[in-house]
Amino acid sequence: YVPIDEEGEAASKTLEYAFDDWTIARMAQAMGKGDIAATFDKRAANWRNAFDKDTGFMRARKRDGSFRTPFDPSASGYGTDYTEGNAWQYSWYVPQDVAGLAAAHGGSDKLLARLDEVFNAKVDPSIFEHMEDITGLIGWYAHGNEPSHHVAYLYSYAGQPWRTQARLKQIMDTQYADRPDGLAGNDDVGQMSAWYVFTALGFYPVAPGSGEYILGRPFLPKTAMRLPNGKTCLLYTSDAADEEDS
């Protein structure tokens, strides 16, 4: 893990480096370099070093192994424990091991309850006035900043895909509009737009590098995707607009 007494934003860096290591492992595996893949797969589990089982949040540790105190999961600030966010927003950043994250929380039911806490919280946006990167709030979920973008899809991993579908519609309805201020935040490397495109199609790469996509719900009646091999993939759906999710 990255020690907070030696480097700022240590909690989020620990989580992001773990995911980076996992993607390196996938590349090494594809290249037939099993020894390298095994090394980086082990490093990819370092997210566990940031998890505090007593609070259920990802936290920054000091070099001596203790968590930094005092701890306020709602606190945010540049150069603190997290990059452009807080514990509520970063504690779900384990896209490479959602099953492990659920187990760390005590099982899928516990994970579902924590996800509900994220989206249903009553949060005053003014607490982020000093952080222009944290925008597009739905509870603690911040759609205007990319680290939160996979969170709505985690309901599906926990066995309730209809909850993912309902959250996706909520986000699409409230965070995008065809006007000059129609994006909830900066379109960093195109991610705000990419989330919209993938979600509108009906699937999303929660763990980029895996080659896997989690199903959501399509928002378009028909889509044609031209593939690199020259073929066209056609997606059809019915009742894609405003029907009750089920």
Feature map (PLM): residue ranges:
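Single conserved hydrophobic/aromatic residue that forms the stacking wall/gate
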Residues: 236, 240-246
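Active-site core of glycosidic bond-cleaving carbohydrate-active enzymes
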Residues: 1-219, 223-231
